[in-house]
Amino acid sequence: MKTLKHILAATTLLVTLGFASEANAQVPLENFFKNPEKAGYQISPDGKYFSYMAPYENRLNLFVQEVGSDKATRITSETVRDLAGSMWANGHRILYIKDTAGDENFQLYGVNVDGTDPKAYTAFPKVRTTIIDPLENIDSLVIIGLNKRNPQVFDPYRLNLNNGELTQLAENPGNIQGWMTDHNGKLRVALAIVDGVNTQILYRETEEQPFRPVLTTNFKETVSFATFTPDNKMVYALTNIGRDKTALVLMDPATCEEKEVLYTNDKYDISGLGYSELKKKLISVSCTGHKGTIRHYFDKDEEAIRTKLEQKLEGYDIN
């Protein structure tokens, strides 16, 4: 027994010394601050290209590469500030944001996949740009937010990517926290905070009309519009009103009247919804279970694709 104790003590000492040696190994300071070699991969909507950010002159810039090719094209040449983010506007144009000297007043820019036709869309001093809706099915338009009128409040604008024209769609009184468009890119829903704690849904039939309050909920209640139906008349909504689990329902946005229950789970709240702009249909809903994500499919093709991916990528979480 004494010998065993000595062996254990010696082993413990060796392991401890090993850990101490690893702990004393210094990590170069620049490793914490240097740019990644490549980051932010995104596939173009048509699947022909992918983009990423990589260093050029010690600053993160945009690169585009055709799928199947080994050659990448740098399409921006920033040398003062890193690009803060990017997104595909359509199959041939990419949007990106950057600020000035770290002021976090991010401005929106655009450039073609070959680096031509660069545009500064929101180069306004001391004004910050946010993306409200990329309008995936409308190539030339995007909905953005600008605090141009009031530094503390973001108003919604429709931006024409071809000519840079900005059209203000509403004036935020200060308590609007979110906006929602229909499938034609029309801004028709607003989400506000009232009385400091309650949530209010506002609606309008057309952009020519003012927003009007439709429903106010407290912290115990949930009504969340996910997206409009393909005909833009109803909305798919997640709600727990009248039930103890959040369900997917068909709802009239003008009244918040529940028309039909589309899916509910006995154990879990609905946490996500999948809608295909290409197919113009609801494809799935998801719940967060205690062992992972639970999905219900409305589209058999989508289910088959995901099943095949899960088989090929066993052990990975596919989102």
Question: Where are the regions a protein language model picked out?
Answer:
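Bacterial N-terminal signal peptides that target proteins for export
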Residues: M1-T11
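Peripheral, non-catalytic segments that deliver or gate enzyme domains
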Residues: F33-A39, P45, E57-L62, S77-A84, ...
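Sec/Tat signal peptide C-region and signal peptidase I cleavage site
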Residues: F19-A25
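Active-site-proximal cofactor/substrate-binding loop regions of enzyme domains
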Residues: A72
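Cleavable N-terminal signal peptides
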Residues: T12-L13, A23
